[in-house]
Amino acid sequence: MLRAAGDITGERQFIIIGSQSIHAKHPDRFAGATISLELDLFAKNHPERTEQLNAIGQESRFHETYGYYADPVDSTTAVLPKGWQGRLINMPVTETNGVAGLCLDPHDLLISKYVAHREKDIDFNREVMASGVVDAERLLALVDITPVDETARRRMRGYIEHDRRLADSAPAKADLAGNTDK
């Protein structure tokens, strides 16, 4: 998809902000994240070109052919902690004609999902927390630099603590891709 996005927009770098961004740091994990049919992304250097990605968006010929699609977003789609841009991770990809995907650090990704607080985000965060690849203390620190009100901060802290307790009390188990770390 990155190659197609680059061909359409002339851009060489895209920021990926949705659940698929977990694959930059953990490419062989989290089958739950691979269930998503869309890739939430925007052009890094010329965000105004992002709208052109509708050509490979939902119900496009690209979507019909490959079964997945681009979901053009912008930098305000997800509420992220201060400094997230400096923590972006290069997605290891091949066959993209030099087009790069820059993905959220897993901690920033989870914070954005704690803010959104949709059922699918709650499930995703629990899966990632249970895997042990994120640190609850770091998540709690990021809550303090996330641009949300104090009510949202309290809710986020409560969910992080709850998810940490669930992860700590669960026996060593495989994530949906069959990997074990605990």
Predicted segments, located by residue:
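Compositionally biased terminal segments of proteins
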Residues: 1-182
